A protein has these predicted regions:
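Short, low-complexity intrinsically disordered segments enriched in A/P/G/S/L with frequent Arg
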Residues: 5-9, 14, 19, 25-29, ...
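N-terminal targeting/docking segments
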Residues: 21, 28-39, 50-56, 140, ...
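Compositionally biased, low-structure terminal segments
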Residues: 27, 32-36, 58, 246, ...
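Sec-dependent signal peptide recognition
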Residues: 60-67
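Hydrophobic h-region of N-terminal signal peptides that target proteins for export
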Residues: 67-75
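Noncatalytic, solvent-exposed loop/strand surfaces
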Residues: 75-506
Length: 506
């Protein structure tokens, strides 16, 4: 690698001959597109005089050639290590079923590999490493816990305060067999939850060496992949709820593992903080306060390497912010708008996309990875040097957007899908999924130029990627679906109200 200010070897177009490989198809690989996006961001930063580290074209060619060979062989995504999969992008390589039925009341089951019952109530999504699938659940001693889904504005907490058992499950991915289960914590909940939430909202994370279960006020638990407890960490009791109201809605931010570091965004009414722990032993590496930056948030942070630096990007209110991974130093901030931040920031094609849409403003931002300082758009021009573009009024409340082939797909909690040019912010089309009578909370995923959107009632809409709307199918899960799906080796894995369901062509 060349340091900033030195002479790189070459940065012109690569002269390598990749032969008969379909380069257009290879570029659609999320692995390749993320790599190319990071490279472009670094090159742009260098051209603008920003401190950065650039890869030489020879290094890039060698890396791309290796990735292209794997992609050309038809390799499918195997590991889905945390919320929304590799790099939190919600995009996978391979091919998955586009038509199925998991509802026995609607006829014969179709393209269902297995369906395993999971006791209790949770919105945590599956995390997958090789042939192991992990989920968490909260099992109430008072029996089935109440859950109210749909479109409503009631903010009162749920009546679900009896003793709970927080359980971590490991399933065999190919069969659905439960390999092991561990009770991480047992006791009365230390905080209340929203009527649409659960006491186990956070998706576990794994790096193949350890599994992290984050249970909010009930602590952090690290296991090896055989279920042996490695360490625990108590981060205190949180007060998660909207600012200015005597309400508690529970926590929902999921843990992120990156290079033996565990990153946790812990936002609440007072004393919000971002903390990085050693994934090996739970030792605190650094902590930075976020009071005044974010008074509450239910979003999962994203780790982004681009423009010569690695940063943690946190959705929040009143500010979205980026932090230096090594130290916790704030790099930039952006006045958000939506006062109940939920979506995760996403990095694709050299830009950071982030949205929040509860309350009055509903912004959608495309942030430059070399942003610095306060990059809030100027009120008169709606522009900022730190933004590539900015859409002030059509962001998403619950769902995290998906970026695929230079298009950004953003779905509202009422099922209104808006598709933008990811580079310019130009609106390509608007279309409603469903009849507008059900909520959409699960974040979508993209596989093989198709996108999958699940309603809270368990209806999954499959659309063709592109600048024009084309509905390919509508499929049934047979239960309430709030969690976001996982993808591994050409199969879909949905967490529903009472099951984990594996969907694959049969």
């Amino acid at each position: 690698m060349e340091q900033a200010g030195s002479q790189p070897e070459r940065y012109e177009r690569a002269s390598y001959d990749y032969g008969h490989y379909d380069v257009a198809r290879l570029h659609r690989s999320p692995i390749i597109s993320r790599f190319i996006g990071s490279w472009k961001a670094q090159a742009l930063a260098a051209r603008n005089g920003c401190p950065t580290v650039l890869y030489s074209i020879d290094v890039i060619n060698r890396t791309l050639l290796g990735v292209m060979l794997a992609a050309a062989a038809g390799a499918a995504t195997v590991n889905w290590p945390s919320f929304r999969g590799p790099e939190a992008g919600g995009v996978a390589d391979g091919k998955v079923a586009t038509s199925w039925n998991a509802d026995p009341g609607a006829g014969a089951l179709r393209n269902i590999r297995w369906k395993t019952a999971i006791p209790g109530l949770a919105h945590s999504s599956p995390a997958i490493w090789e042939n192991r699938l992990f989920v968490t659940s909260a099992i109430s001693s008072a029996g089935p816990a109440p859950l109210k889904v749909g479109l409503y504005g009631d903010g009162d907490p749920a009546d679900d305060n009896a003793e709970q058992s927080w359980v971590v499950y490991c399933l065999e991915k190919n069969t659905g067999k439960i390999l092991w289960q561990r009770v991480a914590h047992k006791g009365a909940p230390k905080t209340k939850r929203h009527t649409k939430a659960t006491h186990a909202n956070s998706t576990p994370a794994t790096d193949g060496k350890r599994l992290i279960a984050y249970l909010g006020s009930e602590g952090v638990y690290a296991y090896d992949l055989d279920g042996n407890l490695l360490w625990t960490k108590d981060l205190g009791v949180f007060d998660p709820g909207p600012q200015g109201y005597d309400l508690q809605w529970g926590t929902a931010s999921s843990p992120v593992l990156f290079e033996d570091k565990l990153i946790l965004q812990c936002d609440q009414k007072k004393n919000s903080f971002l903390v990085v722990l050693s994934a090996k032993d739970g030792k605190e590496l650094w902590r930075v306060g976020r009071d005044g930056v974010s008074n509450h948030s239910w979003a999962t942070p994203a780790v982004i390497t681009a423009a010569g630096r690695t940063q943690i990007v946190c959705n929040g209110w009143p500010y979205i912010a980026g932090y230096e991974l090594a130290t916790g130093k704030e790099l930039w901030r952006l006045k958000s708008g939506g006062d109940i931040p939920v979506p995760t920031p996403v990095f694709a094609d050299g830009l950071i996309y982030v949205t929040n849409a509860h309350g009055g403003p509903k912004p959608l931002y495309a942030v430059k990875p070399d942003a610095s300082g306060d990059i809030t758009p100027d009120a008169a021009s709606n522009t900022s040097p730190g933004l590539a573009w900015y859409e002030p009024s059509n962001g998403a409340y619950m769902q995290t957007p998906v970026i695929l082939d230079d298009l950004l797909y953003s779905c509202s909690d009422r099922g209104v899908l808006k598709v933008y040019d990811a580079r310019t912010g130009q609106l390509r089309y608007t279309e409603r999924l469903g009849a507008g009578t059900t909520g959409f909370s699960s974040s979508p995923i993209a596989v093989d130029s198709k996108l999958y959107f699940a309603s809270e009632e368990g209806e999954v809409y499959v659309i063709k990627a592109g600048a024009q709307f084309e509905l390919l199918s509508k499929n049934l899960l047979g239960e309430i679906a709030m969690a976001s799906p996982a993808v591994s080796e050409n199969a879909l894995y949905y967490r529903t109200r009472g099951h984990v369901v594996a969907i694959a062509e049969r």
